[in-house]
Amino acid sequence: MKRISLIGGTGSIGVQTCDVIEQHPDLFELEAYAFGTNVEVATEWINRLRPKYVSATSIEVLEQLKPRLTYEPLYFIGPEGLKECATAERADIVVTAVVGAVGLEPTLAAIQAGKDIALANKETLVTAGHLVKAAVKEHGVNLLPVDSEHSAIYQCLNGERREDVSKIILTASGGSFRDRSRDELADVTVEDALNHPNWSMGAKITIDSATMFNKGLEVIEAHWLFDIDYNDIEVILHRESIIHSMVEFKDAAVMAQLGNPDMRGPILYALSGPKRLEIEGNKRLNLKEIGKLHFEEADFNRYPALRLAFEAGRAGGSMPTVLNAANEVAVDLFLNGQITFLEIERLVEDAMARHEVIAEPTLAQILEVDRAVRQQIQQGIEGGE
């Protein structure tokens, strides 16, 4: 029996993780469950899976939750609650499904407590890859990818020698606006952006997919997960989202992992791999029905977010933290109708241009850079810049 702590239980990855746990009660048990403000979704899964520890973002949210539960777990709140759930004594593995840089501290706490990590929170590696990798090595835990692209690479590398890898190829759907020109993006709405052609995801990651910042963050994540140089990471557009990513080896052989878009597959593989388990309702891939798969260049002129991500990754140090923080604030501003879609990229590029890189930032410095970037952008918007 593998006991699981889930950080970010009400989002898309969190809900699908709960589904996977419920489908395999003989193998998995939910030990701790942390969520933000979605009491309705939290109530359903907490009552169904009955974790020992429950954490919410605030006391107000917790007070809404308590009368809805059919039993009495141990309650926690806020950032400390995330850490309590991440370090729950009996937990074997922590699924970090929370969105944004808020996932960094509980992830580090879990590693220091000797927990394996099923990483769906890409911002953790983007902002503090050097700290996370050092902690993983020091405490001897496993860092397992949940993102479909990184799970695909992880599976392709099973049994292979790292020195035989020539490059990795991340596939990207192109997002909601893949068939629109740059000029046509000037007036797109939030509703347009949230209509992803292939995946069912949360609002933030759906916007990131439309800008391609999501793929950019995945480039930086891949650099840390697989110890690969940025020059050996390629991004290509693949509109069907059937090939989740590929690995090219030095003999020119290419291995790819295919499947219908369903995040429960990567989640389950992170929890059970290399053993493979069935997933109820997982549609089998029928290539005869699909007929054709398409691939295109991911043009940096069409997708400046990709260029910015590679630049931030190569700059290293604190620059990826700036990229991530600026993007998180900009996406929130767009979702709230305060800026246009194309201004997301501009705000990120401006923040990076202002920043003086700290080469080997401490956790405290990362958190301070994150805070300062967010504050600066918010003040600029309020001041009418």
Curated annotation (Swiss-Prot):
Mn(2+) binds at residues 147, 149, 218. It catalyses: 2-C-methyl-D-erythritol 4-phosphate + NADP(+) = 1-deoxy-D-xylulose 5-phosphate + NADPH + H(+). One of its GO terms (molecular function) is 1-deoxy-D-xylulose-5-phosphate reductoisomerase activity. Disulfide bonds: none annotated. Its cofactor is Mg(2+); Mn(2+). InterPro entries: DXP_reductoisomerase (IPR003821), DXP_reductoisomerase_C (IPR013644), DXP_reductoisomerase_N (IPR013512), DXPR_C (IPR026877), DXPR_C_sf (IPR036169), NAD(P)-bd_dom_sf (IPR036291). Pathway: Isoprenoid biosynthesis; isopentenyl diphosphate biosynthesis via DXP pathway; isopentenyl diphosphate from 1-deoxy-D-xylulose 5-phosphate: step 1/6. Keywords: Isoprene biosynthesis, Manganese, Metal-binding, NADP, Oxidoreductase. NADPH binds at residues 10-13, 36, 38, 121, 123, 202. It comes from the Bacteria. The keyword Hydrolase does not apply. It is an enzyme of class 1 (oxidoreductase). PANTHER family: 1-DEOXY-D-XYLULOSE 5-PHOSPHATE REDUCTOISOMERASE, 1-DEOXY-D-XYLULOSE 5-PHOSPHATE REDUCTOISOMERASE, CHLOROPLASTIC. Belongs to the DXR family. HAMAP family: DXP_reductoisom. This is 1-deoxy-D-xylulose 5-phosphate reductoisomerase.
